[in-house]
């Protein structure tokens, strides 16, 4: 629920841009992708126990929403854009089973990326490449459940990123594309424990609607 509230606030802020803007400079998008998310602490727990363990690494898969606005530069072909979104990653789960205790660890992460980019818009029925840079706010939570008791720990971090991609504009209203992103120093630690590590490359399939 908190993630939906955060997304709603962020999209409302971006959509509060002057309403006199040209109609097709606004956009909203969805994406599905895969990125780095190494559950290092869970692996250390797994390596350090003599009991039965089961580690499910699903935290690299993510889905996201975004809102964007593009300024026309010297003409309608060259554009400077800004976009703000929310990416929600899958869970990493570790189960430890002992003769008397059932122990479960779950790691969840979401990110709020803000990106400024340049795009070469070649119109309908053509590819439009773009490159950009920005910052991402990451929040990771590590939850432990033992015999009905629950303990949570979380940490946040802001990191820089680079981004590049291209989209094919099927109509004035819709484009489908591919996007790559590189996060710098996105290892999220607390008290020496690595809650998640999103440093490195990620890629996504994007769908955007312009209006």
Language model features with spans:
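Membrane-spanning beta-strand positions in outer-membrane beta-barrel proteins
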Residues: 25-27, 79-81, 126-128, 169, ...
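Predominantly the C-terminal beta-signal and adjacent terminal strand-loop region
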Residues: 37-45, 50-53, 89-95, 162, ...
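A charged, solvent-exposed segment within the mature domains of Sec-exported extracytoplasmic proteins
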Residues: 130-177
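Cleavable N-terminal export/targeting peptides
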Residues: 1-25
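Gram-negative (and chloroplast) outer-membrane scaffold detector with strong preference
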Residues: 34-38, 63-145, 201-211
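Short N-terminal segments immediately surrounding and downstream of signal-peptide cleavage
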Residues: 23-38
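Alpha-helical transmembrane segments
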Residues: 4-8, 160, 201
């Amino acid at each position: 629920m908190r993630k939906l509230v955060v997304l709603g606030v962020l999209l409302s802020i971006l959509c509060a841009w002057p309403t006199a803007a040209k109609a097709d400079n606004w956009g909203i998008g969805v994406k599905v992708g895969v990125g780095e998310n190494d559950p290092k602490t869970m692996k250390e727990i797994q390596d350090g126990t003599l009991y039965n363990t089961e580690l499910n690494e699903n935290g690299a898969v993510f889905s996201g929403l975004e809102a964007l606005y593009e300024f026309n530069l010297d003409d309608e072909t060259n554009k400077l854009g800004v976009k703000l979104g929310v990416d929600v990653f899958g869970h990493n789960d570790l189960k430890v089973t002992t003769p008397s205790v059932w122990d479960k660890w779950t790691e969840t992460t979401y990110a709020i990326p803000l990106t400024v980019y340049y795009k070469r818009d070649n119109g309908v029925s053509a590819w439009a490449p773009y490159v950009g840079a920005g910052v991402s706010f990451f929040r990771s939570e590590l939850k432990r459940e033992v015999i009905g008791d629950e303990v949570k720990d979380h940490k946040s971090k802001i990191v820089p990123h680079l981004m590049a991609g291209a989209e094919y504009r099927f109509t004035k209203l819709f484009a489908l594309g591919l996007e790559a992103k590189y996060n710098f120093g996105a290892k999220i630690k607390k008290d020496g424990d690595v809650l998640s590590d999103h440093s490195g490359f990620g890629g996504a399939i994007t769908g955007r609607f312009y209006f």
